[in-house]
Amino acid sequence: MAVRNTYDHENGPHSVHGFRTGRFDFGINTTFIIYRLGETLIDAGPTNQWSTIKRVLKPLTIKTLLITHHHEDHSGNANRISKLKKLLPYAPLLGQEKLAKGYPTPLLQKIIWGSPLKVKTQTLPEQLVINQGLDCQTTVMAIPTPGHAKDLTCLFFPEQKYLFSGDMYISKSLKYLRSDENLSQLIASLRKLIELDFDILFCPHRG
């Protein structure tokens, strides 16, 4: 499957680039955007799109992979990217065991995304200094936002006022909840996020 769309937020050395891929295009929940900020990737995309993802990433310098949570569309290719780019991905502490040992996924999710591969990760700290290339560094803050998943962590770049929201925000209203989602935690996490001073939100599904 080819790249469906590309996204570019031009801001000099702090520019963000993304590409959308997916086996199906039945709505925003069946495609996925991998974002790149300099030499850092935000999430790894689904395994059944690896041929496309590999083709895009192969010529790029990638030194850091940040995983927002363990779900297969976000973490699926972390193992492959770690080998391709010789890096150790960062992941939230609460998701590391599932990423390392694997976990069952429902049939529908396997059809849409494929099955995630086990991957060794290092713990995503509360603050991390990352390279953006050309001797440019910036700080990212990990913001725990449980509700959609216990380990869901949003990534806040205070200097650029960027928020990478994982699956925290996809649409303006919820039509249904997954069986493992917690509505009260979702609301509390949203309230936490609106206290942050961000100007641009990057959603891996909506854009």
Please identify what each model-predicted range represents.
Residues 13-21, 110-112, 135-140:
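Short Pro/Gly-enriched beta-strand edge/turn motifs at strand-loop
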Residues 3-57, 154-166:
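Conserved beta-strand hairpin/beta-sheet module of binuclear metal-dependent hydrolase folds
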